Regions:
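Short, low-complexity N-terminal intrinsically disordered segments enriched in polar/charged residues
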Residues: 1-45
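A solvent-exposed, acidic/Ser-Thr-rich amphipathic alpha-helical stretch
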Residues: 36-108
Length: 108
């Protein structure tokens, strides 16, 4: 890999890192605002999606959606408004640890 290719590769990994930060920010914003229908749409929609909560484990996108939309509620659903009134959820994102793989294909 020459210097130009190495620099381009590094730039691509940095772009991926910023995209991940933006996705994490969207998750935090939408979930904190109880906009859980939109929040669920950010998930990968795969059979192996997995969400583990203190009250249960949800496997697959439909199960994850059920947890957030049906169990947590959504502020845009008139049936949920009274139950959500006065509730607040805060997600802090000040200790991020994001590792983009050297090949740029995965991250954790």
């Amino acid at each position: 890999m020459n210097d130009y290719e190495a620099l381009l590769h590094q730039a691509e990994r940095l772009e991926a890192l910023q995209e991940i930060r933006n996705l994490m920010g969207r998750y935090s914003y939408l979930h904190s605002a109880f906009r859980n229908k939109e929040y669920a749409e950010l998930w990968a929609k795969r059979e192996d999606d997995k969400l583990v909560m203190p009250f249960g484990k949800f496997v697959g996108w439909e199960a994850v959606r059920h947890c957030y939309v049906d169990l947590h509620g959504d502020r845009n659903n008139p049936d949920d408004i009274d139950e959500l009134r006065g509730l607040m959820m805060i997600h802090l994102m000040n200790t991020e640890i994001i590792e983009v793989a050297a090949d740029g294909k995965t991250a954790k």
